[in-house]
Each structure stands twice: as C-alpha cells, then as structure tokens.
C-alpha cells in the first residue's frame, strides 16, 4: 500500500498500490459493457473458460485455460513481482509471465502478449526474447559473482537472537564457512546465514544438525529453524 495525503487535511490514508482482481474486473466491466468478465484468484480459481468474446482477470498462477487460446494476454503490476525482497523474484516473475503468455493463441493466429514493465530489466528482456535459458545463464553468473546459491550452498538459522547465537556457538562449522547477518525475520525473530563452497555442503549440514540435536537434548527453551538452501534468504 502507498500513503496518500488528503489535500487540506493532516490525516493520511492508505490506498492499495496494486489494484485487486475484483476491482479491476469491475472497472473493465464498466469500460466494456455487455462483455462477459470473469475473475480467477484467491476466492475461486477457474480451470478453464469458453471461447468467444470475454475478459478474464486472474491473479498470478490462477490463469484459466481459454478454449482456443486467448486473443491477447496483458501482464499488469509487473513491479509487484519484481520488487519482492526475494533472491528469486526475477526468476519467479519470468516463470509466471511465461506460463500466462503460453495461454495466448500463436502469433500467426492473431495472439498477442503485452507486458507493462521496464523493457530494460533482465526478466522482461527474457520474456520478450522468449529465452529463459539466457536469463538463467545471466542469473547464474550474477549469483556466482555475489556468492549466492546455486553457486554456493547456504543455510538459514532462524529464531530469537539468543537461541540463534547459542546454536551457532555450538556448531563445528567448516573452517571456510562464512556466517552472515543477522537480518530481520518474521514475528520479531532474526535470521543468520551460513555460506560454504558447494563441496562443503554436507559438512555444513552435519554441523548445524548436530548443534540442533545438542540443544534439543538439553531441552533448550527457544526453538530454532534450520533450512539448507532456503528459497527465501532475507
């Protein structure tokens, strides 16, 4: 949500930065009177829709298959996918876009795909080129340079600060392990990251699980969550 100041008043109101599927459907219904408008999303996911004229408003991942394919696929709110605080945000955005775009008719049959986004961004370029391999190679090169998976192996240790510190203090990590953090986690907890070369992944995992076992044996009060190669780092 984005803050909006009301003219002439000192109060602030919040408005949604991303228009929901239902609101979008209502607006398009008024713009195209007489055209059937269907929604597919959190409340109800449609598996398919009949051919013929109509509008389908779907949230990412809930796009129904249209009989004969869609005449046009419009990808909106691209920034909402691309700006997520997630190492795989670009990868996930491209996956969802390509899945939605694949539901359009072939270009030779009049099918069109339009993405509302900055065309210079790598995921958008990959979509325009229809080249996920190019994007994957680029991502791998960047992650290798920055020291992120899959170029290295990582583990996250999440819990209250004292419990995380206790587990790491008791872990006999490989000598070349790097401990990064802390970074904020959900519900007031924190997360530390352990990074090792790919060849040392087994040693890292064994050390962390042994330390977790020691805490469990002495019935430590605060739990700690361990994840090797977590999907979310930050």
Task: Label each PLM-derived region with a short phrase.
Residues 93:
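Conserved phosphate-handling catalytic cores of large alpha/beta enzymes
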């Amino acid at each position: 949500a984005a803050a909006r100041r009301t003219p002439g008043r000192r109060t602030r109101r919040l408005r949604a930065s991303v228009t929901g599927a239902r609101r979008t459907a209502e607006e398009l219904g008024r713009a195209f009177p007489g055209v059937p408008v269907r929604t597919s999303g959190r409340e109800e996911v449609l598996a398919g829709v009949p051919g013929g004229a109509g509008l389908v408003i779907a949230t990412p991942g809930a796009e129904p298959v249209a009989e004969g394919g869609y005449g046009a696929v419009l990808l909106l709110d691209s920034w909402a996918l691309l700006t997520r605080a997630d190492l795989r945000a670009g990868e996930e955005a491209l996956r969802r876009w390509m899945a939605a775009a694949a539901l359009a008719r072939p270009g030779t049959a009049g099918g069109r795909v339009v993405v509302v986004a900055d065309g210079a961004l790598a995921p958008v370029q990959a979509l325009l080129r229809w080249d996920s391999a190019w994007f994957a190679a680029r991502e791998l090169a960047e992650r290798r340079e920055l020291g992120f998976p899959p170029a290295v192996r990582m583990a996250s240790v999440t819990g209250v600060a004292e419990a995380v510190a206790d587990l790491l203090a008791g872990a006999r990590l490989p000598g070349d392990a790097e401990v990064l953090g802390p970074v904020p986690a959900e519900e007031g907890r924190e997360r530390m990251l352990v990074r090792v070369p790919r060849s040392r992944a087994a040693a890292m995992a064994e050390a962390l699980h042994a330390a977790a076992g020691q805490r469990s044996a002495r019935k430590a009060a605060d739990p700690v969550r361990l994840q090797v190669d977590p999907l979310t780092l930050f």
